[in-house]
């Protein structure tokens, strides 16, 4: 792909999260002659405004692209090594872009947390993607990079120390400070709407191995109601991102020829503390809708709020001798916005540069 005009094209650059990706790219790679990138969207005026607001140089072109116009999508795709798209819900706006990337052998990264659509796209395009060399990477934000890579890092360490992987890993969110993404709420709404038309989608949503290329592993520990974690001596509550994160962790295991083993179990919950207070907190979290107050798509928290956010996730490998090995993944800034924009940008750079 050496004849491509760009390393990365950011599609959705005028949306709230898209602007944060552009801001990060400008700060990190704006003066890097080794990285060529462009921004894309439907409105020329909005693209110009984003460039002016974020002081993006004239060396970053603007591409006019509409997700419903296959010709404009194909033109964008053929100019770049990787398409980074923040335009969701992906089940409504993502299929054409992904398909064109597959056809033309171009890498693709997104922020998708919609397992039904991901399952559909994998079934439809995986074989052709292998033929053309397109690398399609879903969920390159807070869902699911810290969780997927946290499990990977921990299992590699377990294997290095003990010669075999842990058959059970527990993901435990210790802290998460930040507002939920409006895009996440919109994606959930679109998925619920799809359930009315496709009742069979429910089986995909509840199957932890739905993205594992047909593999079906052992029964997984329940994570849908509060429980007491005996080893950590704390109450834990359901974590609303677990349904997509667990599927992506199991998919990675399958894609790596079951590096973690075919008997691998993984669940993910939110630490609430010990005692009666911890139990009450876990029950409260388990009964609430965490996305009820999420901003509308295209909106988001203030810069001060984003900068003051953070997250901290603990991963616990339960070993055959009864001991445990822990690893942690933490990050500064709001996980759903600033950290996510950094993750997806670096995912794209990783694909084209490493």
Feature-to-residue mapping (PLM):
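Conserved glycine-rich Rossmann-like NAD(P)H-binding loop of the short-chain dehydrogenase/reductase
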Residues: 30-46
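A short, Lys/Arg-enriched amphipathic alpha-helix followed by its capping loop at the start of a domain
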Residues: 24-34, 256-258
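N-terminal Rossmann NAD(P)H-binding glycine-rich loop of SDR-like oxidoreductase domains
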Residues: 6-28
